Amino acid sequence: MNLQFGMPTLIENRTLEDNIALCTELGLNFIELNMNFPEYQIDKLENTSYFADAARKAGIYYTIHLDENLNIADFNPLVTDAYLETVRRTIDVAKKFVDLRDTYGNRVQPLVINMHMHHGIFITLPDRKVQMYERDFETYIKSFHRFRELCENWIGDAPIIICVENTDGFKNYEQKAIEFLLESPKFRLTWDIGHSKAVGEKDVPFLMNHHDYLAHFHIHDGSENPPKNHLALGEGEIDINERLGIAEKQNCRCVLETKTIEALRKSVKWLNLRDSN
């Protein structure tokens, strides 16, 4: 199998060097730098020579995971502008990492910046909850028009894509916004197979209806009842081989997105045993 496998930023590792040491020990190709961590905030990532030099010594490259709080459709323009500026600067960082991908990765695969969709707030009525983005969809979707245009300009002709990841079930208004983003070649999809399993595979119809846009996978095991994810491969209910088959067919990168070092080691061992049979 020609899939490229990487690892997430792990909370047990306090430094970049700790993550790189584990990545190389396990024979993985890349690390997904997670901007939820203080050590990987944009001002830290902009020290690109430090990150690039460390990667070259180890023979690996990076993808980037944007802050999960990122909300480019916030009704407060000050908040939205701050997040948009974060995306702009992250794209500039990613451009500095393209050479690492060219040297240690697969040039055919664009460099990925991963993002979540922010559900926004909801108002609780006596009989139901109303999502504000659904109520004010026109305002919401205008933000995505602006976001797409800005990202297209910022990325330019660089081999970089922004991949939208499923989490706990795309809302209807989010699906419409994602479909608008996917009209641009600068946007694609991340399939997090553990997230989709833990919510009863509710995102699978949408993802499979747009399977040609899949470019990135977060691979970890999970279960529906009780809902669990980020398990080591082989410890849940997911048909991992079937999901990897889709990833390979679509030429996707795969992050082994467990949350502990132990689970990551088990997952790499599972893959090695699988490939040896």
Task: Report residues per predicted region.
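Active-site acidic/histidine proton-transfer and metal-coordination neighborhood
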Residues: 56-61, 72-188
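A near-ubiquitous, low-amplitude feature marking generic local secondary-structure context
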Residues: 6, 55-59, 66, 130, ...
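Histidine-acidic metal/acid-base catalytic patches
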Residues: 2, 13, 17, 21-24, ...
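Conserved beta-strand positions in the central sheet of alpha/beta enzyme cores
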Residues: 32, 63, 114, 163, ...
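A generic short-segment signal for beta-strand/edge and adjacent turn/coil regions
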Residues: 1-2, 30-34, 40, 130-132, ...
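Active-site beta-loop-alpha junctions enriched in small/polar residues
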Residues: 8-12, 34-38, 67-71, 118-120, ...
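N-terminal pre-domain/capping segments
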Residues: 1-92, 102, 188
